[in-house]
């Protein structure tokens, strides 16, 4: 969006160096249609509790949130199970505006996921996941592990989709302390709507009850 129709965009599209690095693979693309709202999908990123109870991580991961003027992100660290035991994994995601999203996965096999999220209707979103990995990992002796990472990420999206396709947006949701900073996120996300005015004053989450 712009401040007025004649103005320049309010933010620039972020360049991802891996996307043009000859040492990284071409994109491997997967597509879905999600029958829910783009905001419900976005809130998934700050709902840290769901990683354990929906995706089966070994614990509820700790996230370090970042808030910018038009972008946001988080670094989530969690134990990940592998055939060689648990390893320290990282999931670092960032967004610019409501539609540009990318996630870097580390710990098992380096992976960059570029998510192209396009609202079709109020409760219909078309999603493309574009994956790239270092060629040395994707084609090396652990190529099977690299491919398994992509399969697992897509499996997790399928798990989330079961919820999103049945999820109603609740403007006055009852939030518990362990749910993640949903309140801060909603205040931040309001800046993307024409009829709503957001700002950078992100206040601490107050638990319900």
PLM regions and their residue ranges:
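C-terminal catalytic domain of Rieske-type non-heme iron oxygenases
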Residues: 9-209
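Short, small-residue-biased leader/transition segments that mark boundaries at the very start
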Residues: 1-5
